[in-house]
Amino acid sequence: MEMEDNWWVTKLKALESKPQRLDALTAMNSAIAKEAALPRQIIERLLTTDQLYDCANPAADSHVPKDQAVDVTLELLCHCLDQLAMDTADEQLSSLLRRGLTHSNPALRAQVLASLFKKLLRQLTVGQVLTLPNNELIFLILDELKQPDTQSTSLAINILSIVLPQRISNADVQAKLVQLLKQNEIVRCRAYELAVVLAKKSATLLSDVTFILDAALSELDNDDVLLQASVMELLVPLAEQNHGLSYMERRRVLDIISYRVQRVEEHPLDALLVPSIMKFFGKISVYQPLKIIGGYPHMLACLFMQLQSEDESILPTAMDTLANLATTPQGKILLNMHFSGAMEKSFKKYGSHTKKLSAHIKKRLLNSLDVIYDFKTPPATEIINIGKNWYECFAGGAHANIIMDLINTPFPDLQMAALSFLKTICKYNWGIVALKNTGGAVEFLLSRQKDLHRDIKYMKWQIMEILSASAEFSPTETIRFTAYVNEGPYHVQADLDVATEPQGNA
């Protein structure tokens, strides 16, 4: 054991000499890769040796060729972390991870955070997250949120969402969180994201981070439109739980934000925020359709006005917003109840949009329709009838001519979006009838064109699979459909050369 320990000490000492560095790192990396589990004291020695971390420093000048030693060092430290019995209840853990978590190389910090997160996930899986002995580890991870060059914001927030609830009421932890709110807007937004993740967990945790959420709300008075849009995006998940929605109601968040739309004429700069506000209300309506559709009619009026526009800068967000409003059964019922005429008018406009707008906007339109019509559990009759009415407004009747026109375009992405929507409406009986009523549609689906993209062939095959199980077709047609399905999506028909005698002159 002593000889083995001396070998590692010698190799670590060699790191001080630049000419010997790469050979020493390579030797240690090879040695640790061969061992399933090195003795704990060797792993600890490696993780606490300054010279090893110095080898992981990236070049200050990006034009300088990459030092191979950096990659070998990262690999070696990754092996160390894998072999470390990482006990989050151990007082020593923060000192073992400190150099990695405070290193200037974001890739190294990401490795340490990933290893720690993996360990915490195991604890979560068995239902026993160990109690941290002090604040040190939390402080180190909170500092990652302040790093200007980070690859690991999400990792750090995921870790903190697991361990921070243990010590969120601690005065020193609260002071550390307050420090984040004094940083630049990027760091502040990371703090807001963390607060929302914690607040979603319980009403108690929401209470503990209310001061951060309140700071986020204060940003809505900022002159920076991009910052306001980012904050609105971060706040959306609060509405997923009733306690989060209650907080938003107490702070009148929805009222304040919707008022910005009403006062656009007085404050023209607020017009820049309207797409973000629409997105905000649309996403919240996925969780709280009654609150949004029933409570903010002027927001819906603004949305319907945008959908009648042909301005391609605002249409994508508007179409996504309508999809969010109409994605749930309750959303469909409420829209049909309160805005029946506006919905029919919007779907008719969608039909005309498919003839006028650019290909990528048409694709976005079809994707939004896919979201509205798709379902996981069979819908009630009322939902089926609402969807049928909206579709016929879009298509101009009980047929699929518009969709087939979009399939017959030279844009593969648009073809795929159109086929995907066709497949979705074929989940409804009225959709199958619409397809059946469309001249050439079934023949196109049954054709075996060789030049089609594989994804398109597969989508056609999926649609035929649905049609083969439908009672809308004759037994003869069903046999043809079933044969097509059994042949598979990529079946190639053999070319038959029929020999014929040349016709002689009479």
Curated annotation (Swiss-Prot):
Task: Describe what happens upon changing residue 263 to A.
Answer: Abolishes interaction with PI31
Alphabetically, which GO biological process terms does the record hold? proteasome assembly
Mutation: residue 261 to T; reported impact is: Does not affect interaction with PI31
Q: Result of mutating residue 172 to A? A: Does not affect interaction with PI31
Q: What is the effect of changing residue 165 to A?
A: Does not affect interaction with PI31
Similarity comment: family membership: Belongs to the proteasome subunit S5B/HSM3 family.
- Record's subunit section: Interacts with PI31; this interaction is increased by PI31 ADP-ribosylation. Interacts with Rpt2.
General function of this protein: Acts as a chaperone during the assembly of the 26S proteasome.
Quote the protein name from its UniProt record: 26S proteasome non-ATPase regulatory subunit 5
